[in-house]
């Protein structure tokens, strides 16, 4: 059995990791940490874990955590992961990091969007953990930067078009709508029930959302040249899920049928990407609680523009599910281990 620690276990992504890992046949969770709930049993913080996990949440002490685990999931806010990562690396631990701290390959870009990076030398040793694009680079890696939720939905939605050089790189627009868990478990006025319920709003408008450079970095690597896009996130009054609607101008005429075949071929061997049949469109309801990304490419016959719709669960394929998928790849486990559950519907 692989002994695993979850650092930052009292947030939504921490809970989701526990939910998945307790059904994983080759993993034992041996340590959970939380600064705000240290000393409490994890099933006190999350009653859904009663009779399944009674570990006591500990303060984060990197050396102590390392003594208890072979692989560590860091589900911490940005900057917090940077503070402990050097110790984990020096002690030879494998880390799947769910923060933004190691996703951007350029420390200057990270500094411009977040704050100065505390250990830029580790950026070179980290791999961006989007399995459908970077699987071979992930195998055996010591530090995997788990992708953000919006970047996952958009990158998977555009990858076939970019790899085949089919669209105008200056024409990309992505509108993405997320459930409230995307804002985390901390108390925020903007996340209160009365602030969110019965409403639908855009935020981070004008290219200022912090996922923007991550999206552009990955799209540029796929295209082989610089890509910029217009990205507008939205908040929807639902617990979980992301629906991205992506627009681009094709370089030559193409039909919906041709795109559907292109996408089916591109993702034919992928266990967690489902290209929907012609006439079907993704819904967050049909991926909720699962690690699937549902995709449908469509051509607007009037304008000729390509429209790609993708749906994921932001806590699963957008965070914890993908983190476990990365762990499986790193460790040589069956890639779908612990992740074979279908969506929770209705």
Curated annotation (Swiss-Prot):
It is an enzyme of class 1 (oxidoreductase). It catalyses: N-acetyl-L-glutamate 5-semialdehyde + phosphate + NADP(+) = N-acetyl-L-glutamyl 5-phosphate + NADPH + H(+). The keyword NADP applies. The active site is at residue 149. Keywords: Amino-acid biosynthesis, Arginine biosynthesis, Cytoplasm, NADP, Oxidoreductase. One of its GO terms (biological process) is L-arginine biosynthetic process. Its EC number is 1.2.1.38. Disulfide bonds: none annotated. Pathway: Amino-acid biosynthesis; L-arginine biosynthesis; N(2)-acetyl-L-ornithine from L-glutamate: step 3/4. The keyword Nucleotidyltransferase does not apply. Gene3D superfamilies: Dihydrodipicolinate Reductase, domain 2, NAD(P)-binding Rossmann-like Domain. GO terms for cellular component: cytoplasm. It holds the Pfam family Semialdhyde_dhC_1. One of its GO terms (molecular function) is NAD binding. It is found in: Cytoplasm. PROSITE patterns: ARGC. HAMAP family: ArgC_type1. Belongs to the NAGSA dehydrogenase family. Type 1 subfamily. Catalyzes the NADPH-dependent reduction of N-acetyl-5-glutamyl phosphate to yield N-acetyl-L-glutamate 5-semialdehyde. This is N-acetyl-gamma-glutamyl-phosphate reductase. It comes from Pelobacter propionicus (strain DSM 2379 / NBRC 103807 / OttBd1). The gene is argC.
């Amino acid at each position: 059995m692989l002994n695993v620690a979850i650092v930052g276990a009292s947030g939504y992504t921490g809970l989701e990791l526990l939910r998945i890992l307790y059904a994983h046949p080759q993993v034992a969770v041996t340590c959970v940490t939380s600064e705000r709930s240290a000393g409490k049993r994890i099933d006190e913080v999350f009653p859904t874990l009663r009779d399944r996990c009674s570990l006591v949440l500990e303060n984060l002490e990197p050396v102590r955590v390392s003594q208890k685990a072979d692989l560590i999931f860091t589900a911490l806010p940005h900057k917090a992961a940077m503070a402990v990562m050097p110790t984990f690396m020096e002690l030879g631990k494998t880390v799947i990091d769910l923060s933004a701290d190691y996703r951007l390959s350029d420390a200057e870009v990270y500094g411009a969007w977040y704050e100065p990076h505390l250990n830029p030398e580790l950026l070179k040793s980290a791999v961006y953990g989007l399995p459908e694009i970077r699987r071979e680079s992930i195998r055996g890696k010591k530090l995997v930067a788990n992708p953000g939720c919006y970047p996952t939905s958009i990158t998977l939605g555009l990858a076939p078009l970019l790899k085949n050089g089919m669209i105008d790189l200056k024409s990309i627009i992505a509108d993405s709508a997320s459930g409230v868990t995307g804002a985390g478990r901390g108390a925020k006025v903007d996340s209160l029930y009365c602030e969110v319920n019965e409403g639908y709003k855009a935020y981070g408008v004008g290219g200022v959302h912090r996922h923007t450079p991550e999206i552009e970095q990955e799209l540029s690597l796929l295209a082989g040249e610089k890509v910029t896009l217009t990205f507008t996130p939205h908040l929807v009054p639902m617990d979980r899920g992301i629906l991205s609607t992506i627009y681009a101008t094709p370089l030559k005429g193409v039909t919906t049928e041709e795109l559907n075949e292109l996408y089916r071929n591109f993702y034919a061997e992928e266990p967690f990407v489902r290209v929907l049949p012609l006439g079907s469109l993704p819904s967050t309801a049909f991926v909720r609680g699962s690690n699937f990304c549902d995709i449908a490419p469509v051509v607007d016959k009037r304008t000729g523009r390509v429209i790609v719709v993708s749906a994921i669960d932001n806590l699963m394929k957008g965070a914890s599910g993908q983190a476990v998928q990365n762990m499986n790849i790193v460790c040589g486990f069956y890639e779908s281990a612990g992740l074979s559950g279908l969506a929770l519907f209705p």
